[in-house]
Amino acid sequence: MAIITTDNKHYRNIAAAIREKTGDEATYTPEKMPAGVAEVYDAGKQDERKEFWNNALMSESDWTRRFAGSAWNDNTFRPTKDLKPKGGSFQMFSGCKITDLAGILRECGVTLDVSGEDWRVDDMFSSATLLTTVPYLDLRNASWGNSTLNGLFYGCTALHTIEGLHLNEDGNTTWGSSTFLNCTALENLTIYGQNGQNGLNLSWSTKLTHDSLMSVINALQDKSGTGTPWMVTLGSVNLAKLTDAEKAIATQKGWTLA
């Protein structure tokens, strides 16, 4: 029990209550009581936060719009355990006001593990206009017809870094028409796995680094000899960043760079 330097039973009871709530063993004087009460408040808020996140993340299926909308920002999005969506992640963060998603997850000591999602991830971050960074996303198991990644980052006008986008190793991950639509600030993009589908359009992202563009080219699946037209749209600004030899890596695999 906490100690107080007075025989006043009332203060002793308050000190005991503070210790019970905070786990502190400090000696409390009347002058220190306000600080102790503040500690109780903070401890209560922490308990409230943990209870909320445990309840919010209790469902193991259907993460549709779980963190969508303007109420989710850098202050309200403070997860206490790993996020492992499955059963559908359509518009999971759509329209949120979170900025540095990758940084917040690291600060909270948790991860966003999408590897178990075997259904929809389209529009997952759509219209999240303040979003600047996205962590590594393992999308190898995601599948939604011809538009698995459609609108994934649509309208993310502040997004400059995607730490990793892991496509299916067999090249079957489909893009849709607006995966990177209006991603005008995007600089850093790393592609893992193989891109074996038409539809990738990065022409809006004119700030992409050379390394990012080479990551896209190196991830192209070898389609040489298939007799089918295959195309990746990079746009004239991005094409100007590549040498003829680098472009040839794509063409030798049967791809046209537009």
For each feature predicted by the language model, list its residue ranges.
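Surface-exposed receptor/substrate recognition regions of extracellular proteins
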Residues: 1-79, 85-87
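Structural signature of tandem-repeat unit edges
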Residues: 49-87, 94-119, 126-146, 154-173, ...
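Short aromatic/hydrophobic-glycine micro-motifs
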Residues: 23-24, 110, 254-256
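Extracellular/surface-exposed low-complexity segments
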Residues: 238-258
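Extracytoplasmic/secreted proteins, especially bacterial periplasmic and envelope-associated proteins
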Residues: 13, 148, 212-215, 245
